[in-house]
Amino acid sequence: MELTLSLLTIFLLFFALSGRCSDKNDFPEGFIFGSATSAYQWEGAFDEDGRKPSVWDTFLHTRNLSNGDITSDGYHKYKEDVKLMVETGLDAFRFSISWSRLIPNGRGPVNPKGLQFYKNFIQELVSHGIEPHVTLFHYDHPQYLEDEYGGWINRRIIQDFTAYANVCFREFGHHVKFWTTINEANIFTIGGYNDGITPPGRCSSPGRNCSSGNSSTEPYIVGHNLLLAHASASRLYKQKYKDMQGGSVGFSLFSLGFTPSTSSKDDDIAVQRAKDFYFGWMLEPFIFGDYPDEMKRTVGSRLPVFSKEESEQVKGSSDFIGIIHYLAASVTSIKIKPSISGNPDFYSDMGVSMTWTVLGNFSAFEYAVAPWAMESVLEYIKQSYGNPPIYILENGTPMKQDLQLQQKDTPRIEYLHAYIAAVLKSIRNGSDTRGYFIWSFMDLYELVKGYEFSFGLYSVNFSDPHRTRSPKLSAHWYSAFLKGNTTFLGSQGIMQMQSNFSSSASS
């Protein structure tokens, strides 16, 4: 599948511009551009070659929901996908390893077929000049550990996670130089243990359909264990592998660009509370060795306490911060007092109400183009946490899953070029941001809404047993940008590009 544009389109890409113009070469030397997937969302082959269920398999199967049993079938089509990455011009590709494929029971024997798959995939990437960025945990711990001792609510998982990380470092570290231990630690914790809408589906909040859990305590226990597991794996890498392999180990979190819903002082204060709970909860331990004072005051005894040794181990344990960013949120202060609330949870502790900045409704929507939100996040981290190295590990916008309509994904291009420009502006303002990954490289099983909408640069025909891939307009645009054939497009240029794409597709 050739990823080329007509001479007319290239001409338009150069000259149909508006506003400030930039191209890939404006970014600092060494800055990387890539795209991303995750194991459960891309691989499929859910019961092949020794893989056992993860919590995602159980969560979706027991609820009779759409699932990732086959999804994009990356397990069988990875060589084809690497060719597409090369044609697109990616510097790097971010993916995750399925813990239950590599070590099916979560600890103990390594699955040789799972090990060989990841070796083959990584070798395929490296041999084609694509830098692998690997995430160890993307919401999908083995169901065996959940059944045995409760998974992340039990500190026993720290030892098992460290042993799993050791296998990955040992087997793949000669090719992998960038490791992210935990994906979106804050959202994994909130979704799985406060709201119960993602695995393992634990909660106690009123109106939630959970059979077990405690939203007052478990989000904080799990968050604590995630931080300790990261610190343990990071320490292992530095002691055993760093000198030989020369890689780095980071941690990622979900971020929002917060803005007050009114000009009131209460809403201004609420924005800072939201930042403390969304950012500070995970970042302050890495920088200062402890949780934000606001969280300690509000959550009180329900918030775990770091021992002196744990504080020292967590502080400074993340070589970089991975940022997952999609949209902005309008924040309103609420008056709920956790001390008098009958059932406090993460949201009542935070004391804010948030309105997501989206276009359309939540069943089929696109995110609003709000690049200021990206700038706000990067500036806040720079100012508040010592300007650590940052990789934007996910950024993108969904569109309704429609094979014909989504090929001409003009709104996605408008979104991406605005956010890439925001990253460049932040770098020029001093942010130590070193890479940017579009979510997602192709259409996948999306973890909350399944196959209702898609983020991919490439479409996947999920009705076709061969899972045929096709480039969308955004794939052509990103490829041209990466190859230095284009600059950021103005709206007129994008619309003309769409028209030209339609003409070439029908000819």
From Swiss-Prot:
Family per similarity comment: Belongs to the glycosyl hydrolase 1 family.
EC nos: 3.2.1.21
Residue positions binding a beta-D-glucoside: 41, 138, 183-184, 326, 394, 439, 455
GO molecular function (one): beta-glucosidase activity
Any matching Pfam family: Glyco_hydro_1
GO biological process terms on file: carbohydrate metabolic process
UniProt-listed InterPro entries: Glyco_hydro_1 (IPR001360), Glyco_hydro_1_N_CS (IPR033132), Glycoside_hydrolase_SF (IPR017853)
Top-rank taxon, per record: Eukaryota
SS bond partners: 203-210
Keyword Calcium: no
Provenance organism: Arabidopsis thaliana (Mouse-ear cress)
Catalysis performed (reactions): Hydrolysis of terminal, non-reducing beta-D-glucosyl residues with release of beta-D-glucose
Signal peptide from the UniProt entry: 1-23
Keyword annotations: Disulfide bond, Glycoprotein, Glycosidase, Hydrolase, Signal
SUPFAM superfamilies from the UniProt entry: (Trans)glycosidases
Residues glycosylated per entry: 64, 209, 214, 361, 429, 461, 485, 500
Listed name of the protein: Beta-glucosidase 3
Active site: 184, 394
Gene behind this protein: BGLU3
